[in-house]
From Swiss-Prot:
GO terms for cellular component: mitochondrial inner membrane; mitochondrion; respiratory chain complex I. This is NADH dehydrogenase [ubiquinone] iron-sulfur protein 2, mitochondrial. The keyword 4Fe-4S applies. Its EC number is 7.1.1.2. Core subunit of respiratory chain NADH dehydrogenase (Complex I) which is composed of 45 different subunits. Component of the iron-sulfur (IP) fragment of the enzyme. Interacts with NDUFAF3. Interacts with NDUFAF7. Interacts with CERS2. The gene is Ndufs2. It is found in: Mitochondrion inner membrane. Core subunit of the mitochondrial membrane respiratory chain NADH dehydrogenase (Complex I) which catalyzes electron transfer from NADH through the respiratory chain, using ubiquinone as an electron acceptor. Essential for the catalytic activity of complex I. Essential for the assembly of complex I. Redox-sensitive, critical component of the oxygen-sensing pathway in the pulmonary vasculature which plays a key role in acute pulmonary oxygen-sensing and hypoxic pulmonary vasoconstriction. Plays an important role in carotid body sensing of hypoxia. Its cofactor is [4Fe-4S] cluster.
């Protein structure tokens, strides 16, 4: 066995001589043009830190930086992710927000929806046009009859029928009662979220009186199913118009009391002025409607621009804001309640006599007295409520000025007694999409005020 053997090194480092049995590598004379050897990273790291007397503590020591700039890990602040809702009392139902906070400031707001999804639009396709009506009460369950009104107008447009004048006046009357119901809920719960409890208790007593009007006319306090295609279900009972007049006469005093407590209140103004500001351009780009649009200074009200039923025969003003903040939207809602009282008084004074259902046997069921004497009327009633009436093929988009904004129904008929497709346009969906824009840069407590001013109900958003 030879004492020495030559081993050619790889990558031009040079030949190395390996002594037999020793394991010691001796670098040979580098050849001409060979590259200089560079230590690898692992070789260099073994000399970093404390090398003199290594121990468990000193092994992790590092030399100080040469430029005297050392970033400590304790000073690196990361944003906090906070889950707001769906159990939070200020979430107005089942709203879940994923908030990214920098300290107390909101950097990002991500709404998560769908926790109240019930598949309403699909369920409607399996019901007749009359059986689908109660689903609309349960969409925006704070303004029930306004939803019914939009659906009934859409079906009437496809059927090419028009309800009698008395039915139209009754619709407008209860549509404005519903608007007051909604705005009471919006304003007082907004105040309750911020910390003012008294208006909530004051105004809910008035709200109970309006629920009584609902009950006297339909039998139900909330989900009335009263406004139907072709008119309304029943005529107004005796004495109801007198009681509505007494209510409207005294209700303006309740509004004055709430305004006296809130409008010039220092705490209320600090919590709402310049909070959640939306410019007119942003409001249009996000698809806002209703008070959210009018609060930014755009005078757009479907009762004025595209009148339905008898809104072209009543006089009222459309309040608009100037700054587009929470305070302006509060003032708009309060003034809209006063304008609704004006419309209610005009409806009571101009209420005509006559029928409350369209004179069309294919749509309107026979009267109870006829059913007790005529077998044909009984059969007609049975067929109408089991099979329904056939609607000519076509499609329509019908929108009304609901209390929260533009509530639209896109209805497609294929000629059968069931809708082929019913698409519901909820105003709160677009408002919730703008929550990130409205709350960015505000404090965490201001997010509650912004949710309250949007007047969100998840029955119509999740559907």
């Amino acid at each position: 066995m030879a004492a020495l053997r030559a081993v050619c090194s790889l990558r031009g480092v040079g030949a190395q001589v390996l002594r037999a049995g020793s394991g010691i590598r001796l670098p040979s004379q580098p050849s001409r043009g060979a590259r200089r050897w560079q230590p690898d990273i692992e070789w260099a790291e073994q000399f970093s830190g404390a090398v003199m007397y290594p121990s468990k503590e000193t092994a992790h020591w590092k030399p100080p930086p040469w430029n005297d700039v050392d970033v400590l890990k304790e000073k690196v602040v990361t944003n906090v992710t906070l889950n707001f809702g769906p159990q939070h009392p200020a979430a107005h139902g089942v709203l879940r927000l994923v908030l990214e906070l920098s300290g107390e400031m909101v950097r990002k707001c991500d709404p998560h929806i769908g926790l109240l999804h019930r598949g309403t639009e699909k369920l409607i396709e399996y019901k007749t046009y009359l059986q689908a009506l109660p689903y609309f009460d349960r969409l925006d369950y704070v303004s029930m009859m306004c939803n019914e009104q939009a659906y009934s107008l859409a079906v009437e447009k496809l059927l090419n029928i028009q309800p009698p004048p008395r039915a139209q006046w009754i619709r407008v009357l209860f549509g404005e009662i519903t608007r007051i119901l909604n705005h009471i809920m919006a304003v007082t719960t907004h105040a309750l979220d911020i910390g003012a409890m008294t208006p909530f208790f004051w105004m809910f007593e008035e709200r109970e009186k309006m629920f009584e009007f609902y009950e006297r006319v339909s039998g139900a306090r909330m989900h009335a199913a009263y406004i139907r295609p072709g008119g309304v279900h029943q005529d107004l009972p005796l004495g109801l118009m007198d009681d509505i007049y007494e209510f409207s006469k005294n209700f303006s005093l309740r509004i004055d009391e709430v305004e006296e407590m809130l409008t010039n209140n220092r705490i209320w103004r600090n919590r709402t002025v310049d909070i959640g500001v939306v410019s007119a351009e942003d409001a249009l780009n996000y698809g806002f409607s209703g008070v959210m649009l009018r609060g930014s200074g755009i005078q757009w009200d479907l009762r004025k621009t595209q009148p339905y039923d008898v809104y072209d025969q009543v006089e009222f003003d459309v309040p608009i804001g100037s700054r587009g903040d929470c305070y302006d939207r509060y003032l708009c809602r309060v003034e809209e309640m006063r304008q609704s009282l004006r419309i209610i008084e005009q409806c009571l004074n101009k209420m005509p006599p006559g029928e409350i259902k369209v004179d069309d046997a294919k749509v309107s069921p026979p009267k109870r007295a006829e059913m007790k004497t005529s077998m044909e009327s009984l059969i007609h009633h049975f067929k109408l409520y089991t099979e329904g009436y056939q609607v000519p093929p076509g499609a329509t988009y019908t929108a009304i000025e609901a209390p929260k904004g533009e509530f639209g129904v896109y209805l497609v008929s294929d000629g059968s007694s069931r809708p082929y497709r019913c698409k519901i346009k909820a105003p709160g969906f677009a408002h919730l999409a703008g929550l990130d824009k409205m709350s960015k840069g505000h404090m965490l407590a201001d997010v509650v005020a912004i949710i309250g001013t949007q007047d969100i109900v998840f029955g119509e958003i999740d559907r």
